[in-house]
């Protein structure tokens, strides 16, 4: 689009800045660096994959890590141990249950298909180092998404509550509760008024 404007010789009323940044998937440090360098604009368009749709809202993202403790034991005396992997699966199911609850309660007008907007899932499980022994720890890493207007602290608390409830149903975890921490990627959800001039201008030109 910018190339076409330049080739046409059209004169714009303002400046157009093309900013190519790194770190889009993890933390947005590239965009932050742009701001810290003093670049400002009346409006911006993020060229995120959208199927060429105008998207005036952006979900938030909270990464978390859950440490589940078991009791190590060798294969012959495994009955003396507590398999942290078995416990980990219970917590994985609890996180899945939280997603189902959120699908029924979290709504946003710009996200009619809410299942695409608010994933709550475990994407990584780390446990054990030897095939013939119960591991004493299981580390689960996952992601929780929020919609604009949603309280991030409340969303985090819902995860803590769900994990705690699941742990209370297990005799071992009741006495050895999993440890939840929020670490890594964290981004607040955001949106722009659909009546904002930049949104209406892009819509009218598209």
In which residue ranges do the predicted regions lie?
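Acidic/histidine-rich catalytic neighborhood of metal-dependent amide-processing enzymes
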Residues: 1-59, 63
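Metal-dependent amide/peptide-bond hydrolase catalytic core
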Residues: 56, 63-206
């Amino acid at each position: 689009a910018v190339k076409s404007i330049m080739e046409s010789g059209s004169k714009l009323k303002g400046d157009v800045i093309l900013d190519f940044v790194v770190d889009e998937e993890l933390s947005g440090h590239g965009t932050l660096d742009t701001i810290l360098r003093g670049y400002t604009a009346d409006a911006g368009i993020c060229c995120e994959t959208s199927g060429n749709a105008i998207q005036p809202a952006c979900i938030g993202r909270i990464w978390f890590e859950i440490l589940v403790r078991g009791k190590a034991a060798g294969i012959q005396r495994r009955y003396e141990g507590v398999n942290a992997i078995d416990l980990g699966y219970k917590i994985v199911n609890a996180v899945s249950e939280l997603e189902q609850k959120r699908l029924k309660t979290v709504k946003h007008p710009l996200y009619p298909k809410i299942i695409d907007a608010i994933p709550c899932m475990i994407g990584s499980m780390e446990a054990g180092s030897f095939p013939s022994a119960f591991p004493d720890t299981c580390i689960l890493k996952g992601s929780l998404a929020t919609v604009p207007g949603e309280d991030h602290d409340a969303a985090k608390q819902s995860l803590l509550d769900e994990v705690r409830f699941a742990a209370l149903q297990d005799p071992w975890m009741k006495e050895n509760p999993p440890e939840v921490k929020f670490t890594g990627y964290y981004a607040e959800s955001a949106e722009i008024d659909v009546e904002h001039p930049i949104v209406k201008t892009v819509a009218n030109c598209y």
